[in-house]
């Protein structure tokens, strides 16, 4: 009968479909490897990170270099040159003016980093200046650099002591001016404004004014700044802004909460000077005095990055 044949056909079709559904799925065909898509910003970020790491390594090698004394290298833990110079934005191709480099602690780090692609300008107190100990410090500094021409041979020198020697270099010729722990000296000499004006003049637009300074309490009286070596952060910011700079960033890299700032000899009571202990005649008492101040460590310091507007 036709209806019986139709029913048989339908049943056969259903059985074939069921068998087909139990068969193994077709194996996926292998595809060619496709490289991950990397955005331009990711590539740029990676390159910047690599560059920062390389610079950090370069500064660290300079800070631990054989040209430095063990005593100066021992102070790296307190003065943190790697972190500080990276915060300021140091690059190996910069022209950096270091104002009153003193014994050359920072010059020892900057010179190797800048030797090949940049320039270090040491703006020292003039050797014919009327402050004998500062003039002698410059002579000693120059002699020390002469001992390692392979490190310091490219360092340039300019005398700087306003108002007689009031320029740090040709206008807009530098990328960074470093003022490390000298604001109290500028205050004592009455040249703070002149120093900042000279820094502004020598910097290119966008250039950096890098400041590290012993930090006074916010409510400290100004008279104490000359005596104790500590300066109010608000004063430094005010003076820099008056000279035309813009505060870009603050850092607590060089902060020391153990420093109470109330030492009889001011900041010089602390390491490395330990001046408060020099007059102690008894050796055991002197050792105890020095141990007390060493436990505090070096001073609490502000670390400020200003820029000259473009």
Residue ranges and their predicted role:
Residues 54-91:
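Class I SAM-dependent methyltransferase Rossmann-like catalytic core
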Residues 162-163, 185-198:
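A short, conserved alpha-helix within the catalytic core of class I
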């Amino acid at each position: 009968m036709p209806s019986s044949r139709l029913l048989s056909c339908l049943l056969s079709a259903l059985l074939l479909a069921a068998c087909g559904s139990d068969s193994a799925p077709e194996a996926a065909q292998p595809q060619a490897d496709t490289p991950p898509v990397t955005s331009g910003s990711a590539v740029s970020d990676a390159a910047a990170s690599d560059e920062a790491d390389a610079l950090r390594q370069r500064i660290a090698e300079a800070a631990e270099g054989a040209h430095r004394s063990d005593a100066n290298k021992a102070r790296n833990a307190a003065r943190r040159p790697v972190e500080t110079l990276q915060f300021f934005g140091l690059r190996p191709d910069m022209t950096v003016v270091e104002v009153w480099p003193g014994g050359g602690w920072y010059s020892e780090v900057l010179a190797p980093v800048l030797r090949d692609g940049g320039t270090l300008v040491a703006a020292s107190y003039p050797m014919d200046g009327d402050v004998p100990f500062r003039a002698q410090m410059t002579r000693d500094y120059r002699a020390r650099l002469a001992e390692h021409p392979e490190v310091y041979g490219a360092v340039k020198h300019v005398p700087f002591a306003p108002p007689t020697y009031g320029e740090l270099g040709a206008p807009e010729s530098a990328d960074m001016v470093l003022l490390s722990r000298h604001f109290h000296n500028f205050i004592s000499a009455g040249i703070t404004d002149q120093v900042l004006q000279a820094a502004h003049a020598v910097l290119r637009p966008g250039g950096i004014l890098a400041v590290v300074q012993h930090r006074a309490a916010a409510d400290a009286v100004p008279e104490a700044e000359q005596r104790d070596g500590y300066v109010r952060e608000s004063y430094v910011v005010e003076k820099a802004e008056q000279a035309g700079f813009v505060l870009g960033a603050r850092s607590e890299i060089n902060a020391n909460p153990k420093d109470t700032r109330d030492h009889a000899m001011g900041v010089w009571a602390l390491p490395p000077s330990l001046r408060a202990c020099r007059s102690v005649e008894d050796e055991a008492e002197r050792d105890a005095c020095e141990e007390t101040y060493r436990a505090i460590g070096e001073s609490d310091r502000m670390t400020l990055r200003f820029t000259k507007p473009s």
